[in-house]
Amino acid sequence: MDIYAVAVGRVGVELDAAQLERVRATHLRVQGWGMEKYPMYGVNTGFGELINVIIPPQFKSDLQHNLLRSHAAGGGEPFPDEVVRAIMTVRINCLMKGYSGISPEALQLLATMLNRGIHPVIPMQGSLGASGDLAPLSHMALPLIGDGHVRKNGVTRPTMEVFQEEGLTPLKLGFKEGLALVNGTSAMTGAASLALYRARHLLRLSLLASADIVQAMNASTRPFSHTGNAVKNHPGQVVIARLMRDLTEGTGLMRDHQDIMRAISERTSHSNDVEETEIYLQNAYSLRCMPQVLGVVLETLQMCQRFIEEEANSVNDNPVILDTPAETYHGANFHGQYVAMACDYLSIAVAEMGVLAERQLNRLLDPHINKPLPGFLAHAKTGLFCGFEGGQYLATSIASENLDLAAPSSIKSIPSNGQNQDIVSMGLIAARKTLALCENVGTILSVLMAALNQASHFTEAAKYSAPIRSIHEKLGKVAPRYEDERPMSTVIAQVRGVLLQEQGLALAQSLVNLDLTPDLSLEPRA
């Protein structure tokens, strides 16, 4: 099962019947242990620092419902529906492993809500990332007991109003069920999975922009040769160099290294004196270092995918229910450090794509270094007309903002919960920052690709490689040659709408064959 397909594509989920029987067996085992008063965290104890308080069986439902209500303490704006759907999907997958004590009925109700588009209202703020994402998952779980609010068809309403319309009945939770729903990493992992998907698309766009600008600026083909890149030993660098060759194949705008050497020889007198030519044997870094810069971005995405996918398919509950009370694992599988650090790495990679794009934009616009293109790509009479001067301010501003967002969250632990939670991951903060960075870098790349589309009007457009011509054709339909006749923000928004919506995703995937597994996926069973 693909998280993105469920979260964004609104594909439904179906619970495996055989696995539900395993879930039921574990649930019944926990209910029996609770009645027999075996000491077990969250079954017959208080929560967190209150673990030393023993709770008699007659309060089993009160204990679980109180947990959900008291820990539904999130703040800030609610997550958009697609993030909520990702969170629900990942939590269902964790609980379907059969190690948590949840009832099949609770899982079926959660899946029904997901399939009918009934989305719990989950505020963005409030998670420390250990014990898991308590606040957001409590908000996710409230509707199961008829509490809280849900959003359906974009309208937020009390849960019971929607349940009554849909013929759904809230549950009375048994031993450990509330804890099973909230004590895990599913909020950060759901958000991180969407950030990873978006980062992969941004890498494709970054490659397309890079293949475009080296043609617009008549750059050298030599930096992308296989031989030179292969001796560096990094697989990602070799892949990016290959993709740059693929995306520029057939171009009539780039320069062969031998031709550059020949031109230099023709310009010099071969005397023993120092001579200055106007020919550069090598291009600036933003036209030359894509294999090195984007290669490590590619490998970082691959590493982060492994961390996030493993977490999405993990049992991240506590305690982990095994065959007997004595074997049951009281530990810390709820801790989100893997996801937190994956998101921090991912944030740096996404921010670096923004840095590269902003520098490429500057090289395309700066009248001192962008010859033979007009300054700021003004269509005529530069100075009277400003061209993309204003667009550069937006890109540079966002690139600077990104430097703050890329600072790590996973090392910013603050003790809480009576010193019980004395080292936490801040994983959801890291995931939220990564999502914000993806939005920001999407805007920077939109400015760059709008400018590259404008640059094609000042070059021999027919000489671009076929993949880049297809991009120009697509963008030209919504953003024709810019002549200062409309607000620059309109141009950027139109280009962004093409690049970052489904048609842009499909086009980029068809043009850029990244060496990544197709989708972040969930295993169907334990």
Swiss-Prot record:
Residues the record marks as active site: Y41
Keyword Isomerase among UniProt keywords: yes
Keyword vocabulary terms for this entry: Isomerase, Lyase
Residues recorded as bearing 2,3-didehydroalanine (Ser) in the entry: S131
Protein modification: Contains an active site 4-methylidene-imidazol-5-one (MIO), which is formed autocatalytically by cyclization and dehydration of residues Ala-Ser-Gly.
Catalytic reactions of this protein: L-tyrosine = 3-amino-3-(4-hydroxyphenyl)propanoate; L-tyrosine = (E)-4-coumarate + NH4(+)
GO BP annotations listed: toxin biosynthetic process
EC number annotated for this UniProt entry: 5.4.3.6, 4.3.1.23
Cross-link 5-imidazolinone (Ala-Gly), where in sequence: A130-G132
Domain of life where this protein originates: Bacteria
Residues given in the record as substrate binding sites: H71, N183, R288
Keyword Signal: no
GO molecular function, one term: tyrosine ammonia-lyase activity
Job description of the protein: Has aminomutase and, to a much lesser extent, ammonia-lyase activity. Primarily, catalyzes the rearrangement of L-tyrosine to S-beta-tyrosine, which is probably incorporated into secondary metabolite myxovalargin. The aminomutase activity exclusively produces S-beta-tyrosine.
PANTHER family: HISTIDINE AMMONIA-LYASE
Quaternary organization: Homotetramer; dimer of dimers.
Protein family per UniProt: Belongs to the TAL/TAM family.
Name of the protein described by the UniProt record: Tyrosine 2,3-aminomutase
Organism: Myxococcus sp. (strain Mx-B0)
